[in-house]
Amino acid sequence: MTAILERRESASLWARFCEWVTSTENRLYIGWFGVLMIPTLLTATSVFIIAFIAAPPVDIDGIREPVSGSLLYGNNIISGAIIPTSNAIGLHFYPIWEAASLDEWLYNGGPYQLIVCHFFLGICSYMGREWELSFRLGMRPWIAVAYSAPVAAATAVFIIYPIGQGSFSDGMPLGISGTFNFMIVFQAEHNILMHPFHMLGVAGVFGGSLFSAMHGSLVTSSLIRETTENESANEGYKFGQEEETYNIVAAHGYFGRLIFQYASFNNSRSLHFFLAAWPVVGIWFTALGISTMAFNLNGFNFNQSVVDSQGRVINTWADIINRANLGMEVMHERNAHNFPLDLAVVEAPAVNG
């Protein structure tokens, strides 16, 4: 009898836990994805803060030349970063227990891999949690779909690119100047500015900013007057009101006359779908471009493609970019190799005798 009661209490406790996890009445929705999201993001955030403040220098290139990234080792907020895991580790899974000591783990950049792996699980769980909450509320799933764009971008630079290049040391450092360094080196090695998927990403980000500003300014400029001159226009809206707060016909007429008629949406639903889809698709393409360049399917190469009748090269902007790429590549990992990879792979001329 006691065993039966204990089983009932246990089942009841589990049932109450399940109900609490999936309840939409909580101030913050947890969800089953949240059960994974909370510990992984807390771990990633905690280790990031500790490592950013106090991590010792990391031998990023695997040549016994440690690079300092933390505040206590001479950096500031702008120059500081979590240094990627050492090239000596490559793509090996490198948890703390795989190192001979904690000092060795820190020297080889173990915190970077720990942070990236937990962060990846956390943001994927956050995306799943968005879908889960939408499902429970009877909403459509497009919020999670939109969030998949930054998830894809983060996955590309932190996971796919290191896999393609053969080492986590090629991943993006977790810091401001480290991010810029990653961008410069990426351009030098892959000519990303000449990759069409990057161009689509630029169009998505800047186009999304433009469309967001246009939409916000049009709506703000065509609000239906509900207040006096002495009140804020924002007081004219009450949360949950049924009537429209702005005149879409006026906004449509203005923009149609400013550009041309068919440049303006006359359907609010299709307009907002467009505002969501444009940057999302652009960032998807950028993430796809990073993932292909990870395996050295690089941007277009138009170097020395224009010549005169005598066969002499007429430089174009492609040649200027190529010269800049070589200069940046020379300065990258300058103690790990003596020449840019583009020059190092050229065969030496044959010597007779």
From Swiss-Prot:
Q: Where is this site: Tyrosine radical intermediate?
A: Y161
Residue numbers binding chlorophyll a ChlzD1: H118
Sorted keywords for this record are:
Acetylation, Calcium, Chlorophyll, Chloroplast, Chromophore, Electron transport, Herbicide resistance, Iron, Magnesium, Manganese, Membrane, Metal-binding, Oxidoreductase, Phosphoprotein, Photosynthesis, Photosystem II, Plastid, Thylakoid, Transmembrane, Transmembrane helix, Transport
Membrane topology, as annotated: Multi-pass membrane protein
Q: Where does [CaMn4O5] cluster bind?
A: D170, E189, H332, E333, D342, A344
N-acetylthreonine-modified residues are where?
A: T2
Q: What is its EC number?
A: 1.10.3.9
Q: How is it modified after translation?
A: Tyr-161 forms a radical intermediate that is referred to as redox-active TyrZ, YZ or Y-Z. C-terminally processed by CTPA; processing is essential to allow assembly of the oxygen-evolving complex and thus photosynthetic growth.
The domain of life for this entry's organism is: Eukaryota
Can you quote the record's cofactor note? The D1/D2 heterodimer binds P680, chlorophylls that are the primary electron donor of PSII, and subsequent electron acceptors. It shares a non-heme iron and each subunit binds pheophytin, quinone, additional chlorophylls, carotenoids and lipids. D1 provides most of the ligands for the Mn4-Ca-O5 cluster of the oxygen-evolving complex (OEC). There is also a Cl(-1) ion associated with D1 and D2, which is required for oxygen evolution. The PSII complex binds additional chlorophylls, carotenoids and specific lipids.
Please provide, in alphabetical order, the Gene Ontology terms of the cellular component aspect for this entry: chloroplast thylakoid membrane; photosystem II
- Site features described as Stabilizes free radical intermediate, chain residue numbers: H190
User: Which residues does the annotation say bind Fe cation?
Assistant: H215, H272
Write out the propeptide range(s).
Answer: 345-353
GO process annotations (BP)? photosynthetic electron transport in photosystem II; response to herbicide
Q: Which family does it belong to?
A: Belongs to the reaction center PufL/M/PsbA/D family.
Know the name of this protein?
Answer: Photosystem II protein D1
Source species: Chlorella vulgaris (Green alga)
